[in-house]
Curated annotation (Swiss-Prot):
Name used for this protein in its record: Ribosomal protein L11 methyltransferase
Reaction(s) catalysed (UniProt annotation): L-lysyl-[protein] + 3 S-adenosyl-L-methionine = N(6),N(6),N(6)-trimethyl-L-lysyl-[protein] + 3 S-adenosyl-L-homocysteine + 3 H(+)
Localization of this protein: Cytoplasm
PANTHER family the record matches: ELECTRON TRANSFER FLAVOPROTEIN BETA SUBUNIT LYSINE METHYLTRANSFERASE (PTHR43648:SF1)
Organism: Beijerinckia indica subsp. indica (strain ATCC 9039 / DSM 1715 / NCIMB 8712)
Binding site for S-adenosyl-L-methionine: T144, G167, D189, N236
This protein's UniProt keywords: Cytoplasm, Methyltransferase, S-adenosyl-L-methionine, Transferase
Protein purpose: Methylates ribosomal protein L11.
Length: 300
């Protein structure tokens, strides 16, 4: 999701309608304009007389609420579209917020820290120092730390040589791979601001020669095609884009490749696993952390 995201629309409806709305949003807008997620409300969250499913539609400034409400109305009716609540999303400097109240993040052999906590780095740590960059903080720690921990597990037995980081964000996973494996890592993100931040972080951590992020949607960039076939892929993004990426990931990976996926809630796991199983990728390991799920798959 782009850092230009400014609004989320929420509405409650039946499950089938929720899925139709999410699919229509995905078909109508590009992933850097709008994205939708659906989930079942917990019993305590449900209001009497209202359906038990919710749709959340995240909009960038380039998409008008009116256009999305009109889209919702074609499926759910004008009354439901009008009743959808609109909430502005605060843009945050994730690192600045982290520096205010969060300790360095330790994950296996890795330590992610701000400049103010260089004292936390131990002799054998693979330390990654992150400079400030715009990013959404929701779930960032759980999903990224989960990926680092899973990567730490995988690389105790295997030694990938061709690595891809899809949705690199601040570049933490790509830098971790470069630091540990001393290999070039292809990385991309749909958000140009994230790519600029990731490039800056790579320079700051001395791995700019190995990590050169590009702006790209999925695996579409020539640099990503040139680096294939990969034997390790990271994708720490939302469930719906993860499902959509399954065929592309299959095309750019070699047999026996390890795929580490995160950005998932527990309810998202069956759908994501199904999408990748169809492409010949089987579950090897799972890690649940701070409400987020990280999956390790292997291509058969």
């Amino acid at each position: 999701m782009s850092t230009d995201t400014s609004t989320v629309l929420r509405l409650d409806c039946e499950e089938a309608i929720a899925e139709q709305i999410a699919d229509l949003v995905a078909e109508t807008f590009s992933s850097d304009e709008a994205a939708a997620s659906t989930f079942e409300l917990k019993p305590a969250e449900r209001k009497e007389g209202l359906p038990g499913w919710r749709v959340e539609i995240f909009l960038t400034a380039s998409v008008s609420e009116e256009a999305v409400r009109a889209l919702v109305a074609t499926i759910a009716g004008a009354e439901v579209a009008t009743a959808a609540t609109s909430t502005p999303i605060e843009q945050r400097d994730w690192v600045a917020a982290a520096l205010e109240g969060l300790a360095p993040v330790r994950a296996g052999r890795f330590l992610v820290h701000g400049a103010h906590r260089r004292d936390a780095v131990r002799v054998n740590d693979l330390a990654i120092e992150i400079e400030a960059a715009l990013a959404f903080g929701t779930g960032h720690h759980g999903s990224t730390r989960g990926c680092l921990l899973m990567f730490d597990r995988v690389t105790k037995a295997r030694h990938p040589k061709q690595i891809l980081d899809l949705g690199t964000g601040s570049g933490i996973l790509a830098m971790a791979a470069a630091r540990l494996l001393h290999r070039k890592v292809e990385a991309c993100d749909i958000d140009k601001d994230s790519v600029l931040a990731a490039r800056g972080n790579a320079r700051h951590n001395g791995v700019a020669r190995l990590v050169r992020p590009v702006v790209a949607s999925g695996t579409s960039h020539p640099a990503i095609h040139a680096g294939a076939p990969y034997d390790l892929v990271f994708a720490n993004i939302l469930a719906r884009p993860l499902r959509g990426l399954a065929p592309s990931v299959a095309r750019v990976t070699q047999r026996g490749a390890d795929i580490i996926l995160s950005g998932l809630l527990a309810r998202d796991v069956p759908g994501v696993l199904s999408a990748y199983r169809i492409q010949g990728m089987a579950l090897r390991d799972r890690l649940d952390l701070e409400g987020w799920v990280t999956l390790h798959l292997r291509k058969q």
